[in-house]
Amino acid sequence: MKRFIIFLFAFPYILFAQDQLTFNDILKIKNQDIFLKTVIEKGYSEGNSTANKLYYGLGLSKDKSEATDWAEFTTLNSEFYFEQSNLEYVRKYSEGKCYYDQIVSEIKSTCEYNKVMKHSSSKNGSVNFTTYKCSGAKYKGYLGFAQVDGNGVIQLFPK
């Protein structure tokens, strides 16, 4: 029981102490291989991937249906996204280490605003994203961000 209580207090620290996703990590993603390298090195585990979509999660459940954070890559168009779950909790307990907020701040300060673009998915429906063109990015397209149901999403809109 004592070990369990220690684990409960240590879990948030362990979760947030991982090597977090950065703006520079995202700028380097130019294809499926670099996406996989990034998520694997950041500690993500493969979820229920298909031939067309690669799903990776942090803190992935045994049945691979739930995770604290998600990353997805669509093989048909090289679209990708990263989702940090429960921003309110992360902001409160991570002592300023909310990687979604850090990445959004860097996008807004170093990239050029493009426009608001809609992205539709079966999970979230239609969502408006603020998009930017980032010089030095290896991907072809616009990087967007939005908050959806309390989660922070960084999304590539490929050209």
Residue map of PLM features:
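Bacterial Sec-dependent N-terminal signal peptides
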Residues: 1-23
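Short, solvent-exposed mixed-charge patches
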Residues: 158-159
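A local structural micro-motif
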Residues: 9, 47, 114-116
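Short, exposed beta-strand-loop hairpins at the edges of beta-sheets
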Residues: 132-151
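Short beta-strand segments that buttress and anchor functional surface loops
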Residues: 57-59, 130-134
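N-terminal leader/targeting segments
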Residues: 18-85
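Assembly/interface hotspot detector across virion components, adhesins/toxins, and nucleic-acid enzymes
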Residues: 3, 15, 111, 115-121, ...
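Long, charged/polar, surface-exposed segments that mediate recognition or autoinhibition
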Residues: 67-127
